[in-house]
Structures are given as C-alpha cells and as structure tokens.
Curated annotation (Swiss-Prot):
GO terms, biological process: defense response to bacterium; response to 11-deoxycorticosterone; response to dehydroepiandrosterone; response to estradiol; response to growth hormone; response to progesterone
GO cellular component, as recorded: extracellular space; Golgi apparatus; Golgi lumen
PANTHER family xref list: ALPHA-S2-CASEIN-LIKE B
Domain of life: Eukaryota
Protein location: Secreted
Family of the protein in this entry: Belongs to the alpha-casein family.
Phosphoserine: modified positions: 23-25, 28, 46, 71-73, 76, 144, 146, 150, 158
Tissue expression as described in the entry: Mammary gland specific. Secreted in milk.
Ribosomal protein found in the keyword field: no
Protein name stated in the entry: Alpha-S2-casein
Gene: CSN1S2
Length: 222
C-alpha cells in the first residue's frame, strides 16, 4: 500500500515537471516567433501599415493647416477690430482738434470785446486819435462850381441875417440883453458845471444804474 502511494506521488511529480517544461518551451517559442515577426515588420513593412501611417500623417497635416487658417482668421479679425477702434479714436481726436481751433478763432473776438468794455466804462482813458478826412478827388470844373455855390449860399444867409437884424424891435433887444446877463451870472457860478461833470462820470462808470428822473421845468417869473 505504501509502495502504491509512493509511486503515485512520483508520477504526479514527474507529470508536473513535464508540463512545466512544455509550457516554458511553448512560451519561448511564442516569444521567438513574435520577435521574428516584429523584426520582419521593421525590415519589410506591409502595405497596410504604410497606408495607415500615411493616412495618419495626412490627417495630422490637414489638422495643422486648419488650425493655422483658424488662427490667421482670428488674427485678421483682431486686426480689423483694432483698425476700427483706431479710426473711431482718430475721429474723436479730430473733433477735439476742430473744437480747439474754433475756440482759438473766436478768442481774439473775445479779447476785442473785453478791450471795448473798459473803454466804455472808462471813457477818459481813450486815446485821442487825429481823424484824417478822406478827400475825394474832384475835377477843376466841379471845384469851381462848388465854390460858386458856396459863395451864393453865404451871400443869401448874410442878407437874411441882415434883414432879421433890421426887423428886431426894442422889446426883443431888451429880452436879449436880459438873457445875456443871466448867462453871464450862471457862467460865474461854477457849481452846476461841477455837478454835471460828476453825474456824467457816474453815468459812464455805471451805465446800468441810470435812475429815471422826471424833469420839472423851472420858470422864473419877473
């Protein structure tokens, strides 16, 4: 009985060894075959592998071209937007320059207005300028006719004054003498002239403050 068990164990052990040897030999054979196939593929590639690699390269190049086209279109769009922004900024800048030019064109008028203002408020600071009359050019005939006409008018006025003087009565002479005396008295009394000059000075300094006064005539009865 013991011998039978011992023989069975030996048979099992031998069988395991043979199985392991066979499996290891099969694995080595498979690995050698795969290595040979890979080497053959590397040396002599097949048509299918060539097509697959070529197609992959074509697809990759197409994708790169599409990406480059898309990036270029985006860049062109950005450049267009920047140009539009620049043109809008230029328009605003030109408007500002036009407004500044208009202001400087109107500025001399403003200075002229300011210069005229103090002249109105301070009339005594005005510079006395000699007015040069513009003499028109006349012919000799026109000058002779104008001289004759002036002489005739002077003669007529002198004759009219002489006739008026001859027609004056004694009452009118007395009135004239009385008026002359009154005028001489007012000329000696200088206070009204001073008041008149002061009022004119205030009126020139403050032309907007002009009180409305009612003039009451003063009549002196004799």
């Amino acid at each position: 009985m013991k011998f039978f068990i011992f023989t069975c164990l030996l048979a099992v052990a031998l069988a395991k060894n043979t199985m392991e040897h066979v499996s290891s030999s099969e694995e080595s054979i498979i690995s050698q075959e795969t290595y040979k196939q890979e080497k053959n593929m590397a040396i002599n590639p097949s048509k299918e592998n060539l097509c697959s690699t070529f197609c992959k390269e074509v697809v990759r190049n197409a994708n790169e071209e599409e990406y480059s086209i898309g990036s270029s279109s985006e860049e062109s769009a950005e450049v267009a937007t920047e140009e539009v922004k620049i043109t809008v900024d230029d328009k605003h800048y030109q408007k500002a320059l036009n407004e500044i030019n208009q202001f400087y064109q109107k500025f001399p008028q403003y200075l002229q207005y300011l210069y005229q203002g103090p002249i109105v408020l301070n009339p005594w600071d005005q510079v006395k300028r000699n007015a040069v009359p513009i003499t028109p050019t006349l012919n000799r005939e026109q000058l002779s006719t104008s001289e004759e006409n002036s002489k005739k008018t002077v003669d007529m006025e002198s004759t009219e004054v002489f006739t008026k003087k001859t027609k004056l009565t004694e009452e009118e002479k007395n009135r004239l003498n009385f008026l002359k005396k009154i005028s001489q008295r007012y000329q000696k009394f200088a206070l009204p002239q001073y008041l008149k000059t002061v009022y004119q000075h205030q009126k020139a300094m403050k032309p907007w403050i002009q009180p409305k006064t009612k003039v009451i005539p003063y009549v002196r009865y004799l």
